[in-house]
Design a protein with these regions (language model features):
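Cytosolic regulatory regions of ion transport systems
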Residues: 1-94
Length: 94
């Protein structure tokens, strides 16, 4: 599956790590540049650095995603990311 994860703190990172072991293609959207660099160097994922806005979700290719997982610490950001992800074409959102 093609999966986009928004937010790669403790929870998002753990989800990405687990899904990689299951053989999924993962793209991570992370707003913190240091965290994005860390993820890029430790996991075999595509990292899109920036906030989870429409432009960044397009860059993350959400339109082709089977699943978008919003895992930020902000409920508002998670909800909006899922709504935008659906509008852009993500098959499922969490």
């Amino acid at each position: 599956m093609k999966i986009v994860i928004v937010g790669a703190g403790r929870v998002g990172y753990a989800i990405a790590e687990q899904l990689l072991t299951e053989g999924h293609d993962i793209t991570v959207v992370e707003s913190d540049p240091e965290r994005a660099a860390y993820i890029s160097s430790t996991l075999d994922v595509i990292v899109v650095e920036g906030r989870a806005n429409v432009d960044q979700l397009r860059i993350a290719n959400v339109a082709d995603a089977d699943l978008l997982i919003a895992a930020t610490t902000s409920d508002e950001t998670n909800l909006i990311s899922c709504m935008v992800g659906r509008k852009l074409g993500a098959t499922h959102t969490i």
